[in-house]
Amino acid sequence: MIEVMDMRIEVVLLNSLAKRLPGQDPQLGDRLQSGDWTALRGERTAVQLALRWHHEPGVSGNSATVYLQLNGPVALSVSRVMPVPVRLPVYPGHDDNILTSQPGLIPDLLQALKPVEHPAGPAYLLRLTDGQWQVCWLELVVPENLASGRHDFSVILLDGDGERVADAGFDLSVSPASLPPQTLLHTEWFHADCLADYYRVPVRSEAWWQIVGRFMATAAAHGVNLILTPIFTPPLDTAVGGERTTVQLVDVRRDGDAWSFDLTALKRWIDLARENGIPN
């Protein structure tokens, strides 16, 4: 069963490419059908779960608390898809392959959820607002030892007392092949200065190195295998008269006509990247 609706809650499974803007219903072509979700062993893959609660006459309040449980052969991580305010979604001269040209709330941020205790066992707490869709991102890395073929998963929504209020099912088809090692070099912006500024820690402090390492590990988990390294700090994106936090890893010293270069911090950066799964 892909979609279920009782008197209170709608449950719809969507493919991972669907992006639902606030006020929009899930599109028919985005809905997950049996056999749609396929993956190789070792592949990171995901589906989306859309929920909408309808206010019941005679019940006070405009929101409902439900608890999400997932059952299947492997565990799925759960994140809430959060909309973020966007003032300029596209530049002039764009083509038609866009979500919207209007400013507003755009689904972008994945907010990881942790299970909480519940009478029926660990579950993810969700608060639903009357008439509004809330989307969850369900993700896994397919284990190398998972048998090929179809694997069934179930979604169960419970109230605070453990009563089932809605459910749905979906399936994953696993290929007998494994995802080969990544050879494409993939990098993303990695702002080491912003990490220092946001977490309010000094550059090169032990706290800063720990934070950088965690972000490197997260980048590697999402396919980044080449990291931008701040050997020097060029004045990029810096206002005239302003200053951007310096994070260059090469210390340069001039003594008369002689120059010396200390690569200690650069070596630590390279070692840290390799320890966290980024080889380049």
Segments predicted by a language model, with ranges:
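Short, Lys/Arg-enriched N-terminal segments with co-localized hydrophobic residues
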Residues: M1-D6
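Contiguous beta-strand segments within globular domains
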Residues: L32-E56
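An acidic-aromatic substrate-binding cleft motif
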Residues: V165-D255, S260, D271-P279
